[in-house]
């Protein structure tokens, strides 16, 4: 669509009276408190109830938009479980269409991962009992309904899932949820002039919006004590990757990736966060200065005006979160720990190598997803070497496994990427060492898929059978 002189003059008129109407281009200058999802914990064998339903949410001040969510709110509660627990979930689908749910990064057998075989029709329930046997990590739950994942996650069926263990409990790092330990769920959307999310599937690639949201809020701030603050970052966007940095150039101290703690903290000035990827960072607020996390350059005024007339992929604001220190004493006063975990040595050698190709068109290795086809058969307790290539840069995820990144386009991975992972950004070629720790079965296979949700919906999914160890 061309941007004519008439449209520019119309837009100029709109801009003059922007203060009178709630336009998205005006939202970047307004800050609101960070919404912190309620904490839902497993206690003494009691089930965790998760109701999938319609709700309303305010993305812009003074408006309430129809959305989907869990337990009556946009997105869902933060779930916290402990290693060694057997957690009973009760999903209840109160929406008018079929939904399946999964916990991405959870290491459980295939029948407990969700997917087509665990589809919930309207008013149906699913009640898995999940054995939590993995180390502390930040995971996330979300819809993974075939051909509908992108729309359903965009609508609000997602949330954070925390696994804790004895190590995470005793490390001298912030662990008071909502006080010095915060979930930060990053998404991009496109809002109409009344603050209602708009979604239209792109002709190719994945959806990219122009409005940045954190926990469902634009340009949020949070008041913190003067000390260490822990932020659990999740990219829950459909396809957008973020490059995060601090507004004053101070370091981000990365302590954890998808599958748990790094051996030691890694200090970086810029941090990549791919769709589906999770990272935990510590920020030092001792000096008492307000600081923000940002993700690049915001749209210019011309780009904003253009956005009134055609969909835009340029973010109106790139402000992720502002940290405002208060006079409160810090709960954690220790120095940054030198070590978080002992260095693990990989035992055993890869038993085989595989090539995985993600093209511009939907499909993996030239084949669209087929619920009746198993693409990979492996053995529980073994390692394999996967070489994953992508013509179009995209995020890639494997269910039911942990992997280490061996190299990225022939070079060593960055230090912050040298821990256990389940999601990786592929721009060219990455080589992974994949460990099969959980079994799956033909009717309950694990997925490996593009984490560009629209590409997955169009068929960029493979199915994996992991035979149980004898």
Swiss-Prot record:
It is found in: Periplasm. Residues 1-27 form the signal peptide. Its main location: periplasm. CDD domains: CuRO_1_CueO_FtsP, CuRO_2_CueO_FtsP, CuRO_3_CueO_FtsP. GO terms for molecular function: copper ion binding; oxidoreductase activity. SUPFAM superfamilies: Cupredoxins. One of its GO terms (biological process) is FtsZ-dependent cytokinesis. It holds the Pfam family Cu-oxidase_3. Predicted to be exported by the Tat system. The position of the signal peptide cleavage has not been experimentally proven. The keyword Signal applies. One of its GO terms (cellular component) is cell division site. Belongs to the FtsP family. Cell division protein that is required for growth during stress conditions. May be involved in protecting or stabilizing the divisomal assembly under conditions of stress. This is Cell division protein FtsP. The lineage of its organism: Bacteria, Pseudomonadati, Pseudomonadota, Gammaproteobacteria, Enterobacterales. The gene is ftsP.
